[in-house]
Amino acid sequence: KIRADKKERSRYKEVYIMKLEEKNLIVKRAYKSVYKCDDCIVKVFNEGHPKSDVFNEALNTARVEETGLDIPKVKEVTQIDGKWAIAIEYKTGKTLEDMMESDMKNLEKYMEDFVDLQLQVQSKKSPLLKGMKDKLARQINGLKDLDATTRYELLTRLESMPKHNKVCHGDFNPSNVVVGKNGKMTVVDWAHATQGNASADAAMTYLLFALKDQKVADLYLKLFCKKSDTAMQYVQQWLQIVAAAQLSKENELEKDFLMRWIDVVDY
């Protein structure tokens, strides 16, 4: 049985290597390339990418699987040509982002479905996921673009915010929602998942929308607050905190936008 399992893993790796060609490349980021390989996708991380980050993404995904949410399951963590890689189930369909952009007249309907899906995710608990407030504090503490006084004020505000334990995606935006032919929506890419405050997760989603289109961001926030019975001001209290956390990802295209949010902090 053990030999058979090893043989099967070896066969999978050979298939992955054969399929890792430009024609199968789905997404290329600064630190990883994502390929379509038969019934799965394979994320291949650059050499030098922290091993702990790779295993953390796989572990996050596995823990969210255990909540009962229907998400793409982890199939394998392996090395390919000296680079760490994760194989995850492939979900057929279009991204909700593509559907929104090609059918703007139905934007509000798509956004309602999007918010319903986010609330479904946030209804779950996963006690072993990392705590959101701890992660946000680490990200803010590590920022070199902010002076010590600003970091202190942000951390003080973070500490004063309520601590919850809902499953939060951390990068919940329409590009991470796949819609199948039957209309079923699936959330992908759980690398940033934590347990924490749903309104903080909503604040991050709002910022991600606002980076592209302020009107769409405002529509999202209105629907989220209505459907979750949350005061808009409460979500807005998280905006400076999550803007600082997003700044830690060092995306130069977002830097000026995020700094403007951080600069308007009213202490």
Predicted regions and their residues:
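The N-lobe alphaC helix and its flanking beta3-alphaC-beta4 segment of protein kinase-like domains
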Residues: 51-67
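Internal "kinase-insert"/substrate-recognition segments embedded within catalytic cores
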Residues: 105-132
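Short beta-strand micro-motifs within the conserved protein kinase catalytic domain, predominantly
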Residues: 73-84
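ATP-binding glycine-rich loop module of kinase domains
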Residues: 24-55
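Helix-rich C-terminal or lid/interface subdomains of diverse kinases
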Residues: 203-267
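An alpha-helical support segment within catalytic cores of ATP-dependent transferases
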Residues: 123-170, 181, 186
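Hydrophobic residue at the +6 position relative to the catalytic HRD Asp in the kinase catalytic loop
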Residues: 177-179
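Conserved short submotifs of the Hanks-type protein kinase catalytic core
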Residues: 82-95
